[in-house]
Amino acid sequence: MHMSEIMEMLIRRGFLWQSFEIYGGMAGFIDYAPLGNNLRRKIENIWRKYFVINERAAEIDTPTIGIEEVFIASGHATSFTDVAIECENCGRVYRADHYVKEKLGIEVDETVEAVKEVMEVYDLKCECGGRFKDPAPMNLMFSTTIGPGKGKKGYLRPETAQGMFVDFKRLANFFREKLPFGVAQIGRAYRNEISPRQGVIRLREFNQAELEFFVHPGEKKHPHFSLYAKDVVKLVDKFDSQHEITLEEAVEKGIIANQILAYFIGKTRRFLLEIGIKDEKLRFRQHKDVERAHYATDCWDAEVLTSYGWIEVVGIADRTNYDLKRHSKFSGEDLSVFVPYEEPVKVKRRKIVPILSKLGPEFRQKAKKVAEALEALNVEADLDEVEVEVDGEKVKVTKEFFEIQEVEEEVTGEKVIPHVIEPSFGLDRITYSVLEHAFDKDVVDGEERRVLRLKRWVSPIEVAVLPLLSREPFESKGMEIVQMLREEGIFTDYDDSGSIGRRYRRFDEIGTPFCVTVDHQTFEDETVTIRDRDTTAQVRVKLGELPSILKELLRSEKDITEFGEVFRQV
């Protein structure tokens, strides 16, 4: 099976189209055609079932444009880069590690130094024969201006996550500061890829589904881990060692850093299998230290084997509290939560007691804020002076303005900045992978048949109603059945063009699991046939029972033979 054969079918049948096609198109952009859009929406809704409803998470929707301060704080303004190489002759720009792998067949670390060394050793040249300039980092964010004139600098978001971190104070209040809690978002993100060459695999505008699961830094166990603990998963660790092991064992042996990461690996695997990813073509690979994102301490990718090779479709990262700490520092807001102890405890501590009679004359209108900043400090030893921050300004305070006392206090809890475990899903790659894994060919009645063996619950068109003959009363009866099924919430299409066999093949190719045929017997006894896409078997059922039978079939993997005797295969 070649990717060009699959893409030809997806374009021709209305799953994916090239964006801006009448103007020649542009790499890195695709349009979801009617069938592809419906498929992706169904995948999104199953994702919601797993990661919003079952996790009791809150789903929010934040702007796709962010102000510059957000991305300075997050680190994207300086760290969200790929190494690029530009040809001195033709001016083409390539992503360095991809170009090296394509031309030399070797992996190279994504650093300027490593790329430069490979270029020199192998005398790497452009496809036009020209020489490259020295490699340089390129930021992948799209910049924009917010407002008229010079306006305010902003960026198209490179991930949905930052909107959830920026809203953390409100979200913590929404959850009454009770950890753990999850926040989800589905939406568009943007990355100005240097040289996107892999169709739907590397896009400049793409769809993400992300969950930020906020936890106590010292409590990385999940109360429902037992649901997935015995699941056997295929793992490739950061040393390239392969394991086929239960998640429980992987945590015990230290292969996976903590139970919550393992829990979401298990949940992700179940989700991918439910939407149609094949288990034998699914693995989880741990990031090597050199490739791990700047914010992560551990990260596992769900990778799917396709005609492009192994591609990452999900990243599951322990981001610690990097993001919240950064946004707290740059915004000046307290992004901690108060975690109460089961029982109050008494602790001795050294505290700074400001001498207010001296602070006033010295610091005047700032005296109150200086005093509050002093009282908030934790001290371990006697100090001659301390430095506090007041209104963004560093202020030095010598020991004549304060005393250090040892006090015993009753403490009812502690303030912590939560850690976050993040499963991040690339919906476009997932949608394409589902389609490729479903693509199949077989022989029926001596002819080759193309069929998308999609899971019934993700098929963009669930049922097709086909009149045996393209004339009355078959057509009007067919449309009557279509209306009945649509009112029951079943995605139903109607087709009376061409032979019945040709129509079956058309719906097989787009993955429609069931075809309902109106034939001569329909008018004799109010029955119709249901044809199964995968087996081509047909059974006859009563028209009045059709909606309930189809609903039961569409939400399960039941065989149609449970509802009638097979009398024909075509």
From Swiss-Prot:
Location of the protein in the cell: Cytoplasm
Catalytic activity: tRNA(Gly) + glycine + ATP = glycyl-tRNA(Gly) + AMP + diphosphate
One GO CC annotation: cytoplasm
Keyword annotations of the record: Aminoacyl-tRNA synthetase, ATP-binding, Cytoplasm, Ligase, Nucleotide-binding, Protein biosynthesis
Root EC class: ligase
Gene Ontology biological-process annotations: glycyl-tRNA aminoacylation
CDD domains from the UniProt entry: GlyRS-like_core (cd00774), GlyRS_anticodon (cd00858)
Tagged with keyword Aminoacyl-tRNA synthetase: yes
Molecular function terms, GO-annotated: ATP binding; glycine-tRNA ligase activity; protein dimerization activity
Matches recorded under PROSITE patterns: AA_TRNA_LIGASE_II (PS50862)
One Pfam family linked to the record: tRNA-synt_2b
Residues that bind ATP: 191-193, 201-206, 312-313, 426-429
SUPFAM superfamilies cross-referenced by the UniProt entry: Class II aaRS ABD-related, Class II aaRS and biotin synthetases
InterPro entries noted in UniProt: aa-tRNA-synt_IIb (IPR002314), aa-tRNA-synth_II (IPR006195), aa-tRNA-synth_II/BPL/LPL (IPR045864), Anticodon-bd (IPR004154), Anticodon-bd_dom_sf (IPR036621), Gly-tRNA_synthase/POLG2 (IPR027031), Gly_tRNA_ligase_arc (IPR022960), GlyRS-like_core (IPR033731)
Residues the entry annotates as binding substrate: 95, 159, 206-210, 422-426
Keyword Glycosyltransferase found: no
Listed EC numbers: 6.1.1.14
Signal peptide: none
Family statement drawn from the similarity comment of this UniProt entry: Belongs to the class-II aminoacyl-tRNA synthetase family.
Protein's job: Catalyzes the attachment of glycine to tRNA(Gly).
The protein, known as: Glycine--tRNA ligase
Organism: Archaeoglobus fulgidus (strain ATCC 49558 / DSM 4304 / JCM 9628 / NBRC 100126 / VC-16)
